[in-house]
Amino acid sequence: MSHYLGIDIGTSGTKTLLIQADGKIVAEATAEYPLAQPRPGWTEQDPELWWNATVKTVNEVMASSKVKPADVKAIGLSGQMHGSVFVDKQGNVIRPALLWNDQRTAAECDEITSAAGGRKALIKMVANPALTGFQAPK
């Protein structure tokens, strides 16, 4: 029988589901992790937490279901919105990730908006305003 793995790497934890082709849930597992707030309005996480939680929940789901890995026909993955993971030339993470809800880039948003000729001009150019949660200001 075909099975499908769904992995949601969220802000507070990772949830993994194993389902059958008809949508019936066969197994599920969740692993939570902390959110660092080093200053008011700042939110960060170590991306290693996401990886460890993903490995843990996939292993738990596969072990509890006794489904063979070869029977998993596809993997669906969703992750946090607009987080920035900064890496060096070798691909190593160099600092905690700035999350989608991090608000430290208000000054950068103002600078981008001004450089574009104002809010309306920026929206006309890229179809969005500069917001603290988006990638460009980070």
Language model features by range: what are they?
Residues 4, 16-17, 84:
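Generic short beta-strand
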